[in-house]
């Protein structure tokens, strides 16, 4: 069969490879001039920067894409596990290193607060049990009809997840120490949610880091995009770049998706898998006579969106890789207040920031004697933060100064401004324009209880035959391992339909 995949981000690349490995003719259409989507790369002034995701968690999910296609993952990506997850800075003289080794972890916890290990381990155990339930009964399955969700098994297993509790509540149930609470709560921002609003299940990230480890891909995270692109090439997939999709064509008589309009041309296909940002697709790519019924264009703005980010890619003329970790977090003096600012639409003058220094793990990513630094500052998305004008150069200059001041609170970056030789920024406006991410959201639809599992945009269209959706705003959600899972379960359903002649 001839299959179209819209979008050459990690979801589209993984899905296309899986389909092609089953013997089908696959074409990927990508609007930009390179593959990767949000898993993008910037090469500038001799530095190589990952532009989007940077942390490799759940490596088996990465490997599975290649092995499921009959290939050896080691021929495409080079993975290695990190001994230390990150350094965390609470203030200038207060730094802790978070290890994966349990003995070292205990020492770290006890140094923060004697006796805190028991509560922390109880938290990890509870979350791991919830994760296994969620993975088996909710995350790794699709919901094609109401009875797939509304049944006794889902009711019983869902009750065990205690989804009405928020992430903050679960953390505070086990952890009394404010520093350790910050360590756990901050990571919900990795998928763009407010720990006060996100279901308690979304406190799984620290557990995943501890249980499965954190890894690094040689060449940076973009090495995964390159590996997937090579996998697709080896499987005979055709990737068309600079291919802007104008519309998904719906046959009004048979209510099926049978073509796409791309760069002015109508291209016929047997099935279409769309991995572009779902809200933008529902708003702009469906014909007027054939909207997605649950998500018509006029309702898209009313959905809840994850936060965005202001990113800086900084090159400095000194090598500091022996003084920092690969991953680093510098906390705001008012962590809870900063969270409120992000989700209430206000800019912070004292943000918590994430700092990634890729040359710590791969020297080839920066010129000799120099260091590339990636800084992420969570911000409101464009709807909640409608009063923020990201096109205002004076504003972006002010935010850069805020970030440089925050970096300068740790010793290694005290004099960073005098060493800058390269600087690039990426704003919420850029997320919207470059990736068609609605409201510049960095992680798609926010996974609130009302926008999760059965209540999230589904992988198989309920309105039109031969139309499928995958990606961060669809089930099961955002984050690289999760969108790779989205690709897998969506392709599994497509292959079942093909085998049944549906």
Curated annotation (Swiss-Prot):
Binding of FAD, residues: 5-17
Reaction(s) catalysed by this chain's protein: 15-cis-4,4'-diapophytoene + 3 FAD + 3 H(+) = all-trans-4,4'-diaponeurosporene + 3 FADH2
One Pfam family here: Amino_oxidase
Keywords: Carotenoid biosynthesis, FAD, Flavoprotein, Oxidoreductase, Virulence
One GO-annotated biological process of the protein: carotenoid biosynthetic process
Enzyme Commission (EC) number: 1.3.8.-
One GO MF term attached to the UniProt entry: 4,4'-diapophytoene desaturase (4,4'-diaponeurosporene-forming)
Keyword rRNA-binding: no
Family under the similarity heading: Belongs to the carotenoid/retinoid oxidoreductase family. CrtN subfamily.
Family annotation (PANTHER family): PHYTOENE DESATURASE
Annotated protein name in UniProt: 4,4'-diapophytoene desaturase (4,4'-diaponeurosporene-forming)
Originating species: Staphylococcus aureus (strain COL)
Lineage of the species this protein comes from: Bacteria, Bacillati, Bacillota, Bacilli, Bacillales
């Amino acid at each position: 069969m001839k299959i179209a995949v819209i979008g050459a981000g990690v979801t589209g690349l993984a899905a296309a490879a899986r389909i092609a490995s089953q013997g089908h003719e696959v074409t990927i259409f990508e609007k930009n001039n390179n593959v990767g989507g949000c898993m993008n790369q910037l090469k500038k002034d001799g530095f190589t920067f990952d532009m989007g995701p940077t942390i490799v968690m759940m490596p088996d999910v990465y490997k599975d894409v290649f092995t499921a296609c009959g290939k050896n993952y080691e021929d495409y990506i080079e993975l290695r596990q990190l001994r230390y997850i990150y350094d965390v800075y609470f203030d200038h003289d207060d730094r802790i290193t978070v290890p994966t080794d349990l003995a070292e972890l205990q020492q770290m916890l006890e140094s923060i607060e004697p006796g805190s290990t028991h509560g922390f381990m109880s938290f990890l155990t509870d979350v791991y049990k919830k994760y296994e339930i969620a993975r088996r009964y909710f995350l790794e399955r699709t919901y094609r009809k109401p009875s797939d969700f509304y049944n006794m098994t889902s009711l019983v297993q869902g009750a065990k997840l205690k989804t009405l509790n928020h992430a903050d509540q679960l953390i505070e149930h086990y952890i009394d120490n404010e520093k350790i609470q910050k360590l756990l709560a901050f990571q919900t921002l990795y998928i763009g949610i407010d720990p006060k609003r996100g279901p308690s299940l979304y406190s799984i990230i620290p557990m995943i880091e501890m249980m499965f480890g954190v890894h690094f891909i040689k060449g940076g995270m973009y090495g995964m995009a390159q590996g997937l692109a090579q996998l697709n090439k080896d499987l005979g997939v055709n990737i068309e770049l600079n291919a802007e999709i104008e519309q998904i064509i719906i046959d009004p008589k048979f209510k099926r998706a049978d073509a796409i309009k791309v760069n002015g041309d109508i291209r016929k296909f047997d099935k279409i898998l769309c991995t572009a940002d779902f809200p933008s697709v529902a708003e702009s790519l469906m014909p007027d006579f054939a909207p997605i019924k649950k998500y018509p264009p006029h309702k898209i703005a009313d959905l809840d969106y994850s936060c965005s980010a202001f990113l800086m890619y900084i090159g400095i003329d000194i090598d500091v890789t022996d003084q920092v970790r690969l991953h680093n977090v510098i906390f705001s003096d008012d962590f809870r207040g900063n969270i409120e600012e992000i989700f209430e639409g206000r800019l912070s003058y004292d943000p918590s920031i994430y700092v990634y220094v890729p040359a710590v793990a791969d020297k080839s990513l920066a010129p000799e004697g120099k260091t590339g630094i990636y800084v992420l500052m969570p911000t409101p998305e464009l709807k909640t933060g409608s009063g923020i004008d990201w096109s205002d150069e004076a504003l972006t200059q002010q935010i850069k100064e805020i970030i440089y001041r925050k970096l300068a609170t740790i010793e290694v970056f005290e004099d960073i401004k005098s060493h800058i030789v390269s600087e690039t920024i990426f704003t919420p406006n850029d997320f919207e324009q470059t990736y068609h991410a609605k409201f510049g959201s960095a992680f798609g639809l926010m996974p609130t209880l009302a926008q999760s599992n059965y209540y999230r945009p589904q992988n198989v269209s309920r309105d039109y035959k031969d139309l499928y959706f995958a990606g961060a705003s669809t089930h099961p959600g955002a984050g690289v391992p999760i969108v790779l899972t989205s690709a897998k379960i969506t392709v599994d359903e497509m292959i079942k339909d093909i085998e049944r002649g549906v």
